Amino acid sequence: MHKVAKILNTLAGHRVVLVSHGVGETLSCRHGHFQDATVSEDEEVLVLHGAYYTLFAARHEVEIHPDELSIVFSRFNAFGDPIANAFVFCPGEDQTSPRDILREASVALAEAR
């Protein structure tokens, strides 16, 4: 996980594209930038601080400026590398559960269509 954070830190400030699997559909996120990447104490969550990203829904774009974006790695590929299959959007001091945040994002995208 620390190797992943180190790699992501080399991308800080550059445009990167991430894909997350939300509730019922895939949410595509294009990041304008993020400040840095760190790993949680339990080494299960990678956090991108100062992330800026855009959610794409058909022809509509919803810009979001959270304080951080948490990436939960919950499975591994054949080489043992972590594969991110859930990106959790956590603005500031929001205590909403990751499932609720992804559900809200899916609803927002559906309504935008």
Question: Which residues make up each language-model segment?
Answer:
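Short beta-rich binding modules
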Residues: 1-8, 12-113
